[in-house]
């Protein structure tokens, strides 16, 4: 009976770049995951900011609706007095009443919109279900006091779009699938390994680790499948198809990036025009209300005209 103890090791030589390409592929996949996480974080931050400012805008709409309701209720009170005195017809009185109910419905509609915006913002902020159901979101500063957004300088290079996380993520996937082609092609070639063994051999357990009991060996081995029925070839074609699909996704991502830029620039330009027109409208209505108030103070018109102007 012989007793032996041995330690063996094997090292596969990466002649064909199989493991190098596999490492590159995994690294690019990891970078894609990191950049995709960054894109998701930016998306959530953007949605949160948009939801917050939308909530502030809805607050202003609700406040305006409440002021309109009070004004129309005051006007309706005057219409009611004049109707009882026979100064106006029932048709005018019913129209005034309808305006009150229209304003009241607008208040309720704006209240629902504000509540929905609060719940959406609470979800984006990761609040608990109890907070989502009951808490009122803090508003912070007045939206009308916010500084104007900075003006984008003209002539910005389109290369800036390469910094977008979604574009970078798509690019990393192309690189990963390209490296995967190298992994698949390496299967066409044999695997070459260095092997070695170091141990002891003895007929006695006592002499197993002493005396002339040492034994060692080394060598080079190679292996590859003789018949794979085209599996490796199809794997290469599949890897190439995945790369082409990744290129198509990258092109689509770049197209969407340019579309977003165009939409944003157009929206900003038209928003500036809308703000200017709205400000001119507000100035005209404010001046009309001042004139109506001045005429009423001097006895040239009745208070109903003032309420209509303030409405």
Region locations from a protein language model:
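Small/polar-residue-enriched beta-strand and adjacent coil segments characteristic
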Residues: 1-39, 151-254, 260, 264-267
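Short acidic-hydrophobic sequence patches enriched in Asp/Glu that either
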Residues: 22, 71, 95, 113, ...
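Amphipathic alpha-helical coiled-coil segments
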Residues: 40, 44-67, 74-81, 97-100, ...
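Short, solvent-exposed, mixed-charge loop/turn linkers that connect secondary-structure elements
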Residues: 67-70, 87-89, 93, 107-161, ...
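Outer-membrane beta-barrel proteins
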Residues: 90, 203-207, 303
């Amino acid at each position: 009976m012989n007793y032996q103890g041995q330690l063996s090791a094997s090292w596969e030589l990466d002649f064909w770049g199989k493991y190098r390409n596999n490492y590159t592929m995994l690294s690019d996949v990891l970078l894609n995951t990191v950049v995709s996480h960054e894109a998701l974080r930016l998306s959530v931050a953007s949605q949160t900011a948009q939801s917050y400012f939308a909530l502030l805008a809805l607050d202003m709409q609700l406040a305006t609706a409440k002021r309109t309701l009070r004004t129309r209720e005051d006007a309706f009170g005057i219409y009611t007095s004049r109707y009882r005195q026979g100064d106006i017809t029932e048709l005018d009185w019913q129209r005034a009443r309808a305006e009150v109910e229209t304003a009241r419905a607008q208040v309720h509609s704006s209240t629902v919109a504000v509540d929905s915006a609060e719940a959406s913002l609470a979800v984006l902020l990761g609040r608990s279900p109890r907070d989502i159901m009951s808490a009122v979101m803090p508003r912070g500063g007045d939206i009308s006091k916010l500084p104007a957004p900075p003006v984008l300088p003209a002539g910005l290079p389109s290369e800036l779009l390469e910094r977008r996380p979604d574009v970078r993520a798509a690019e990393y996937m192309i690189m990963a699938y390209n490296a995967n082609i190298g992994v698949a092609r390496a299967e066409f070639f044999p695997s070459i390994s260095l092997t070695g063994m170091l141990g002891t051999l003895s007929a006695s357990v006592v002499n197993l680790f002493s005396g002339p009991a040492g034994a060692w060996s080394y060598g080079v081995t190679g292996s590859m499948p003789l018949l794979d029925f085209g599996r490796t070839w199809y794997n290469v074609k599949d890897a190439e198809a995945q790369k082409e699909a990744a290129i198509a996704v990258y092109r689509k991502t770049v197209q969407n990036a340019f579309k977003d830029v165009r939409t944003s620039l157009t929206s900003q330009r038209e928003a500036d025009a809308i703000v200017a027109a709205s400000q001119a409208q507000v100035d005209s209505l404010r001046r009309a209300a001042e004139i109506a108030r001045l005429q009423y103070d001097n006895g040239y018109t009745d208070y109903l005209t003032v309420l209509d102007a303030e409405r």
